[in-house]
Amino acid sequence: MVTPRRDSGKDRPSLKDARILVVEARYYEDIADELLRGATAAIAAAQAEAEVVTVPGALEIPQAVAILVEAAAREARPYDAVVALGCVIRGETGHYDIVAGESARALMDLSVLLRLPLGNGILTVETEAQAQARARVSEMNKGGGAAEAALAVLALKRAKAAERPDRTIGFTPRRTAETQE
């Protein structure tokens, strides 16, 4: 089995002032507890601030992220990154495919549209045993991994902003002869 390479965070710029939104679905309580434990430990290790908000299920996570990110920006206290935590276990119907696919798609859409670093820690598994193994901090620690992913992208975003402070990060329209007139 191949061992995944993890970002140790040791070469990362300080994230001490970072505000990280953690939105967790509590549908499977024991799994949610472990995912949250891993995520908050990773955020604390980066000396960032975590704000945890709970929603019923995975499909509600993208909605909550959109609402909370907008509200925080309005209050001039924007989030620097988001961590989404939850679990979807395949059942007997096609509901699993809808919840797993749509929650992931909506989160990616939000992340790209808002240029907001986001770690997706929504487990999509066949069995509860698989979910527990992936959630446990002592095993696969997917909650911690999701937080580390968000923190790594935030560090990249900050590093690029520091290189070019006069420019925003993201796409800029290409200027052509027609647009310059």
UniProtKB/Swiss-Prot annotation:
Signal peptide: none annotated. Belongs to the DMRL synthase family. 5-amino-6-(D-ribitylamino)uracil binds at residues 27, 58-60, 87-89, 120. Pathway: Cofactor biosynthesis; riboflavin biosynthesis; riboflavin from 2-hydroxy-3-oxobutyl phosphate and 5-amino-6-(D-ribitylamino)uracil: step 1/2. This is 6,7-dimethyl-8-ribityllumazine synthase. The gene is ribH. The active site is at residue 95. One of its GO terms (molecular function) is 6,7-dimethyl-8-ribityllumazine synthase activity. It catalyses: (2S)-2-hydroxy-3-oxobutyl phosphate + 5-amino-6-(D-ribitylamino)uracil = 6,7-dimethyl-8-(1-D-ribityl)lumazine + phosphate + 2 H2O + H(+). Keywords: Riboflavin biosynthesis, Transferase. It comes from the Bacteria. Catalyzes the formation of 6,7-dimethyl-8-ribityllumazine by condensation of 5-amino-6-(D-ribitylamino)uracil with 3,4-dihydroxy-2-butanone 4-phosphate. This is the penultimate step in the biosynthesis of riboflavin. One of its GO terms (biological process) is riboflavin biosynthetic process. It is an enzyme of class 2 (transferase). Gene3D superfamilies: Lumazine/riboflavin synthase (3.40.50.960). Its EC number is 2.5.1.78. GO terms for cellular component: cytosol; riboflavin synthase complex. (2S)-2-hydroxy-3-oxobutyl phosphate binds at residues 92-93, 134.
